[in-house]
Amino acid sequence: MPYMAMHGLTVALLLIFLAGGTEAFRICAFNAQRLTLSKLAKEPVMDTLVQILARCDIMVLQEVVDSSQKTVSLLLRELNRFDSSRTYSFLNSSLLGRSTYKEKYVYIYRSDKTQILNSYQYNDTNDLFAREPFVAQFALPSKILPSVVLVPLHTTPKDVEKELNALYDVFLDVSQRWQNEDVILLGDFNADCASLTKKRLNSLLLRTEAGFHWVISDGEDTTVRASTNCTYDRIVMHGQGCQTLLRAAAPFNFPRSFQLTEEEALSISDHYPVEVELSQATHNIQLFSLAILLLLSLLPSQLS
């Protein structure tokens, strides 16, 4: 094959392979605002939720209000129909809460890309949490970060400071239990505006102890209403693997992306999802090695 043709083919292959290596692993949290079977019966709500979920490799839903599995099962069925090239599964907590109002934490994840290694309900012996975290450890497609622990929390506005300080104890518990320092704390923390002043926020253990990175910045609006501007929803990362692979983190403004009015968006939720993207380091290393081999294959052509 002539050199120029070989060169063109090699470059084309490199571009294809390297483009494939740019895909990120996305972890999300979303307060879906009293998600029930009757809410999912509204077609625009279902359609939008499915599109939001399809963005994420792991999604942690909060405010799932369902004593049965019907709501999540229906949502999962529609999600798997939406993109048949992917396979989604779920894991949920029991109903949690101190009053008659109770809700679940629900993990919806791409089982073709990740698997749950362990999970447990945090033992809140002192009743510090209204909805104690339901913790899960996931396998990731990365040699740098082979697994990560997710700790979701939906605080109550009147106890934000107490619950967020108690979340530090959950971190200690899970990191010792599974010998894993790569932990992501995420959810609707109510960590802003009237629920938590700047001074109280900066005095939290998760702010003063070393190693915790609040990747959803203060000042980011995670609310749908134009009349509010609060960073209620957060993602806090700990661990060298997480920091090494961190690519981006932000709220997902779904009304803007899907061209919804505020009223239409509020039928879904009054919160934006928050997302963090991790580089898929294993894939990138393999592709880099392949790229080197392809480039070396050009040398004989150049020398002849």
Curated annotation (Swiss-Prot):
This is Deoxyribonuclease-1-like 1. It is found in: Endoplasmic reticulum. Belongs to the DNase I family. It comes from Cricetulus griseus (Chinese hamster). SUPFAM superfamilies: DNase I-like (SSF56219). The active site is at E103, H154. Its EC number is 3.1.21.-. Disulfide bonds join C193-C230. Coiled coil: none annotated. One of its GO terms (cellular component) is nucleus.
